[in-house]
Amino acid sequence: MASRFLTEEWAGEVSSILNSHPGFKSSIANADLGIVYNVTGTPSGDVAYFLRTAGGNADLGLGTLDNPDVTVGSSYETAAAISKGELNTQTAFMTGKLKVGGNLAKLMMHQAVINQWANAVKDMEVEY
């Protein structure tokens, strides 16, 4: 059964998938990273969710973090296209569809985390 994008159910399923995916687990082995994503214009209004990695574990949930390393903002359309694999994050950033703030050097240092996240969830059934 598909999880609805950007809901608690979706966040829980993504978190579970990430923590059981060997490639993702390898990418976060030494990553202490906090990212907050702000998505505007969703069917439920604006939604914030976060990814926190520390100690070889990942936590993804709805809401925000105190003092995230990086903040990412996008429209629902862009977030859904990235989630569906129709748009990669680098292209979205380069075309201005993703607004990124905070410690960009740290984000680039841990680019494998983002790449492995996409790889881990590529077959997840999601309802948009």
Regions found by a protein language model. Give the residues of each.
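Feature captures hydrophobic
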Residues: 1-128
